[in-house]
Amino acid sequence: MFQGKILEYDNDGIVCHDTDDRLIWNQSYEMTAPELSVCEQYLAVYDRGGTFIYIMSERGLVKKIETATPIERVCVARQGTVAVLMKEDDVSYVRLYDKKGQELASGEFYQEKGSFPVDIALAPDAQKLAVDMLDVTKGKTCSTVTFYNFGSVGQNEIDNNVGTYSYKNTMISELVYTESGKLLAISDAGLIWFDGAQKPAPKKQIKFEREIQSVFYNNKYVGISYSDTKKENSWHIKVYDMNGKTVMENDTEIAYNRIELLDNNEICVRDDYNCELFTIHSIRKFRYTFDRQLYNVLSGSDGQNYTLVSVSYTHLRAH
């Protein structure tokens, strides 16, 4: 979903239409591995391993950017600014561009120094950038999260670095900035929350006690699921708020291929034909087996209506 609209994208282009299937805009391109980054009124669609970025708004194309180096990751901020992680040979590059394509900041990382960037996250105001570095030179993994501040506070620091935090025997695979400005780091060992308007610092850490099957999140919550050792063919779901407090727990017997938080903050668990919905208060709200393959589930604004997108037909309203 993007501004209440439905997005469809593939290697040839991206289409935005409303829930009544009316076309809003259509942008064509040629990409091998298109991926999306969304923040409020802007989205960036980019070619992972390619060199093209399309910054889009609810009205359509804002700017097309071509990079000189293959792209690994793009993050967009609420005003359309994008942070771009690129890599070529043993050198990684980070560039910051405004929505007109003008370069705002840049940096380089050399793998010969022992570590390399795994992920980046751009704060919604585009003033802070977090970089996740992985070091495996000594036979053990060590992840480091470094924060850069491009505002007045960061100008007083060397290379705009306002904080660096290392975690031994840990591999942080993903960084996520929420709309409130908190950063979530997802690792093989657990979840770490960082907070701070100018100089973010660790505020909460939860260690995983067993092997995690899935981690899913939105701007308000982050959830995990793992196999229930007490029940065969059952998975336990646990959801935390962005302060690290447990807010929801329940079990599902669907051998799902998709688990996610919907726009109304309900948890949707589904495979190709089965769908289950839980409220954020742990109540199982809905379960059904469909005779057509499910493509997507979208929540309405009132918490009662849903759009179920199937292969054969597009819209079905369910209460």
Residue ranges: model-predicted function:
Residues 2-9, 41-47, 80-87, 127-133, ...:
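Short beta-strand elements that form the blades of beta-propeller/WD-repeat-like
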Residues 22-27, 60-66, 104-110, 158-165, ...:
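A short beta-strand motif characteristic of beta-propeller blades
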Residues 314-319:
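Conserved small/polar residues in nucleotide/adenosyl-binding loops
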Residues 1, 31-38, 69-77, 114-121, ...:
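Repeated scaffold domains used in trafficking and secretory/extracellular systems
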Residues 26-124:
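Non-cytosolic head/periplasmic domains of membrane-anchored proteins
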Residues 19-20, 57-59, 98-100, 151, ...:
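Short loop/turn segments that connect beta-strands within beta-propeller blades
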Residues 93-170, 174-178, 183-184:
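Solenoidal tandem-repeat scaffolds enriched in leucines and small polar residues
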